[in-house]
């Protein structure tokens, strides 16, 4: 199976992303924009959810109407920045279970290491939407995806606000069965591993830290 990258180019998505890129955008507005953009990305990421007809009565007449069916959902945030995405998306799918994966970079090998993982016990039975605003080198995403697979997850989709070509390639090589939904594929990574033109450090801008 080949990885598919869905680029969401809706005018509202691109407008909100441009506001996030602007260095003049403050913490409150940046956080709100990240949540709003996550909802718009979720609309596209969940386009293929299964529905089935359910019979009930409206105030006018009885009929068969489409309702979600198939696998239940799980939203999993890569800490810390992914939280702003899952917090927004869960308002769309309140029955979804929410998990968290914390990552740090080993100072010697520079490899990402999971320091925290709390996932739904029935993760194998759920469609998983993994959230992280930035897909830069792909190291954290790949480690988180492997963590999910080790826990039994079989259906995983990565949702990210920005992606670099290097990160997409890394995920494609390691996990060709995981699709990506993003608002933009930027030009490259700089020497410090930041996405260019990017929007800076998403976590710092969401939480007002440095």
Curated annotation (Swiss-Prot):
GO terms for cellular component: cytoplasm. Pfam families: UPRTase (PF14681). One of its GO terms (molecular function) is uracil phosphoribosyltransferase activity. The keyword GTP-binding applies. Belongs to the UPRTase family. NCBIfam families: PRK00129.1 (NF001097), upp (TIGR01091). This is Uracil phosphoribosyltransferase. It comes from Deinococcus radiodurans (strain ATCC 13939 / DSM 20539 / JCM 16871 / CCUG 27074 / LMG 4051 / NBRC 15346 / NCIMB 9279 / VKM B-1422 / R1).
